Amino acid sequence: MIRHIYKIMIAIVCCLLAIPTEAQTKAEKNGWRLGMQSYSFHLFPLTEALDKTQELGLKYIEIYPGHKLGGKWGDKVFDFNLDAQTQKEIKELAASKGIKIVGTGVYVAEKSSDWEKMFKFAKAMDLEFITCEPALSDWDLVEKLSKQYNIKISVHNHPQPSEYWKPENLLKAISGRSHLLGSCSDVGHWRREGLNQIDCLKQLKGRIISLHFKDIAPKKAGENEQHDVIWGTGILDVKGMLSSLHGSAGAITALQNSVAHYYQRASSADYLGV
């Protein structure tokens, strides 16, 4: 029962390695790794989020900036202000559960000088990518640091007024720049902005580093936002999106914003066999 409860909160990170569960075996056929976005468990401290990730048999996690650590670290949060000893201990804790911290996000720099701090932190934590939304004026600096530290920049597409709400804007910003720079494709936000998510994925082919992969409910009268639902129960073409991603070495993350609402649902991960 616990397995089904937490699988529906899953954030799927798909890259190159396999993970030994039925759904993960399906994903392996596509060359994907499966993992967790820690915001799926934002009601719990990171120590518990790691426990739940381990219970699912997942080996990878992306941690959102500000996630409270819990345990002996109490109210300390996951960000570039963590001292070196705590960074080491968090890596060791994750490793002890067979989990690698592959990324952090969504990060938005308060000032340009913070980018160096974030890249140093990401390097110390052995992260593969930073999910973020850089200011347009910061791109030269971000590209330079990305090359210097060999860490990918995965740009998220929050809705307007975000600069990157549609693929054309991101592609313009990174045109002619390093392929260490690319997209964290949030398919739900595209649909909320009236965009066709499959067309968006096609536009970004070759530039997708990670995805926040989800399905969303139809918009109801009086609602400000279409909430996330289990894959295949909403209005997005989940099978079509997964089919369009065959052969991609990007990362897929299904981001759910509550726990209790989905206790009775089947796992979204079953769709990875598409």
Where are these regions (language model features)?
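Short beta-strand segments at enzyme active-site cores
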Residues: I61-Y64, I101-G105, T131-C132, T253-Q256
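Acidic/histidine-rich, surface-exposed loop or edge segments in extracytoplasmic proteins
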Residues: R33, L69-G74, G98-K100, K123
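Histidine-acidic metal/acid-base catalytic patches
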Residues: A23-S38, H42-Y60, S96, S112, ...
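Active-site-proximal loop/turn and secondary-structure-junction residues that shape catalytic pockets
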Residues: S40, P65-H67, Y107-E110, L136-D138, ...
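The substrate-binding groove and active-site-proximal loops of carbohydrate-active enzymes
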Residues: S38-S40, K76-N81, G105, E128-F129, ...
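Bacterial Sec-dependent N-terminal signal peptides
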Residues: M1-A27
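Glycine-rich, proline-tolerant flexible connector loops at the mouths of alpha/beta enzymes
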Residues: I63-E89
